[in-house]
């Protein structure tokens, strides 16, 4: 590792984990890849990875759930880093768990007919004939700058370009997102506007009710309470300063506006997982950072509060979404936006007082109209059938290249 990387690892208390990862990538992975080079591809095996081994969640989870619910003839394997897993991570019994960055993980990637990931793969053997790689990514609408549009390290860019060369299908949820991917993903292959697999659940009322009950039971939330979910994104500096919110005042505003009891759940971005215990939340606010599946939390929520993240998914509900951006100018300089933040249809506040005022003056009819117009301008493709479309891609690929699953 370079000196700067070592210093950052020590500062973030990840030195030993980073050192192990470096040893794996530079020494063990080449050896394991060589040993697995001539192993046969098993067309009915799908290997999933979510946020570099963070467990059962996001788009890969919902593709797997579709396979299970429809009893499709695939064997599924999940790459797991146990140190990164959180509450709600238990895999279904039909899915095999394999340690992330291990000989078994390289062997699985070498033999699986299908790879599914929602982030850049930081290691993978050379693809063989008959193998396909579906990159789902992990966003719905244009928000933050990503990939070539963002300020990224040379190491990341080098790895991202290598990853893009291996991708067979890159998924998109709308035409604006597709254009962004064409511009900045270092990818010349096929982009398929299937919709976002994780968003299918937002079109299923039974699953929404089931998820709300699951969250309420786990956190002992009264079933009649309404839920505000706070989903801030990460900052490059990993500071917690922008997350200081007047929770008590916000709850008072919600109760005045909607005449109901409210519970607040705060969930940090996965990049901030190691800082979750430093939040110092009031006793009446639930720390939901260790709940792995954001979609389940979104299903349970009645209002979302965010800054620069997760706004697209939740707005599919046409439920209220508020943006709290106390460091807006700093964030513009640090990360920037794919489109001007003012073009979003959601109320934006820079202070706690402004946020409380926006809640009290919220107009549902005007909000719904703005959000629907935003959908049209983005060319939204979400209709609750993204997972079905992904499985058709797999079936068509395997029929064309391999003569089917069997």
Residue ranges and their predicted role:
Residues 98-113, 270-313:
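Donor nucleotide-activated moiety binding/catalytic core segment of transferases
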Residues 57-66, 197-278, 349, 382, ...:
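Conserved catalytic-core segment of nucleotide-activated headgroup transferases in glycan assembly
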């Amino acid at each position: 590792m370079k000196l700067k990387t070592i210093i950052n690892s020590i500062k973030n208390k990840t030195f030993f984990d980073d050192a192990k990862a470096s040893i794996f990538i530079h020494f063990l992975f080449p050896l394991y890849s060589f040993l697995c080079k001539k192993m046969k591809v098993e067309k009915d095996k799908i290997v999933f990875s979510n946020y570099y081994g963070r467990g059962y969640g996001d788009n890969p989870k919902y593709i797997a759930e579709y396979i299970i619910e429809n009893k499709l003839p695939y064997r599924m394997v999940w790459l797991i880093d146990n140190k990164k897993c959180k509450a709600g991570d238990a895999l279904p019994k039909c899915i095999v768990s394999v340690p992330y960055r291990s000989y078994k993980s390289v062997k699985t990637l070498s033999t699986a007919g299908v790879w599914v990931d929602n982030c850049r793969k930081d290691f993978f053997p050379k693809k063989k004939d008959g193998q396909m790689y579906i990159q789902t990514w992990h966003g719905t609408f244009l928000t933050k700058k990503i990939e070539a549009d963002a300020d990224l390290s040379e190491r990341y860019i080098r790895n991202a370009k290598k990853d893009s060369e291996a991708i067979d299908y890159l998924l998109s949820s709308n035409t604006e997102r597709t254009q962004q991917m064409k511009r900045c993903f270092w990818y010349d292959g096929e982009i398929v506007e299937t919709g976002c697999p994780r968003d299918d659940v937002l079109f299923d009322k039974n699953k929404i009710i089931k998820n709300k009950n699951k969250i309420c039971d786990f956190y002992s939330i009264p079933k009649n309470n309404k839920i505000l979910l706070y989903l801030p994104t990460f900052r490059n500096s990993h500071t917690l300063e922008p997350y200081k919110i007047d929770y008590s005042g916000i709850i008072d505003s919600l109760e005045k506006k909607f005449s109901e009891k409210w519970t607040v759940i705060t969930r940090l971005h996965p990049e901030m997982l190691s800082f979750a215990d430093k939040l110092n939340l009031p006793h009446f606010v639930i720390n939901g950072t260790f709940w792995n599946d954001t979609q389940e939390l979104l299903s349970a929520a009645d209002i979302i509060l965010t800054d620069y993240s997760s706004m697209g998914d939740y707005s599919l509900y046409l439920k209220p979404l508020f943006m709290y951006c106390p460091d807006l100018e700093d964030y513009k300089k640090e990360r920037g936006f794919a489109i001007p933040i003012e073009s979003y249809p959601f109320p934006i506040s820079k202070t706690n007082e402004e946020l409380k005022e926006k809640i009290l003056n919220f107009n549902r009819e005007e909000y719904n109209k703005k959000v629907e117009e935003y959908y049209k301008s983005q060319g939204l493709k979400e209709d609750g059938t993204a997972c079905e479309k992904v499985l058709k891609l797999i079936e068509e690929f395997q029929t064309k290249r391999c003569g089917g699953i069997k």
